[in-house]
Amino acid sequence: MTKYALVGDVGGTNARLALCDIASGEISQAKTYSGLDYPSLEAVIRVYLEEHKVEVKDGCIAIACPITGDWVAMTNHTWAFSIAEMKKNLGFSHLEIINDFTAVSMAIPMLKKEHLIQFGGAEPVEGKPIAVYGAGTGLGVAHLVHVDKRWVSLPGEGGHVDFAPNSEEEGIILEILRAEIGHVSAERVLSGPGLVNLYRAIVKADNRLPENLKPKDITERALADSCTDCRRALSLFCVIMGRFGGNLALNLGTFGGVFIAGGIVPRFLEFFKASGFRAAFEDKGRFKEYVHDIPVYLIVHDNPGLLGSGAHLRQTLGHIL
């Protein structure tokens, strides 16, 4: 008889829940709930389990916020809870709450070739460190290392490191944004809101007034070639994504590969392929050759957060991935 665990991927607006086959890691019965419709995460879980008429005793939920102890307070939602209390209330034997990019990183060993698109570099070196990052509402970052037959995720808040410009244009962008918001982190330019910041700074640098555009507007106009400023913003976004990815590669010698997750890049895949991304990734001066062969992959799996939550839980329960 198949034994299932509950897995989840929770963001600021939606909670996606599914079942994970503990033996194989296969994800099934995925369903998305609007977080605004429920008073708590526990309430959503109860609804899901009731709808699917399944009894589970183990669970792992990935959440888009730092996890530092028993008390979890989401940064982009009103939900807050004690892990121990929720585990007790649900009658679970085991409940893990992990950072969303911990989950994405743990999905990588489970991905197949059809879940990846490669952008330059050679083959990954087995057993070497891996980096994963992704732009969405914010900028998530994690690393993954293989130790004693176990995958160990190294989460952090790498999206909030300083934005490090490396061209005259990027320097001007930094000056304009610093005057507006103070500290300019990488997330301030590599995210949905970050794309808007790039567009606005480009227009303001030319002493013009920017339109009130959303990320979707900028992407659509750039792809339609109907707005020079939007096209410049999207091009610069791709270049800065490359620089940032190259920095991650240098930090930990990620010869196992650098992986891009998040919902933004797939929306303009062909544009991204033709952009200056890879050149910027390798633009490391004296260490250009060091990063030259490091492969970069775009993750195109539908639910890496769910897949990785399942992988994390299965490994915790003693399975080898």
From Swiss-Prot:
EC number: 2.7.1.2
GO cellular component: cytosol
GO biological process, one term: glycolytic process
Binding positions (ATP): 8-13
Alphabetized NCBIfam families for the sequence: glk (TIGR00749), PRK00292.1-1 (NF001414), PRK00292.1-3 (NF001416)
Primary role: Not highly important in E.coli as glucose is transported into the cell by the PTS system already as glucose 6-phosphate.
Family label: Belongs to the bacterial glucokinase family.
UniProt name for this protein: Glucokinase
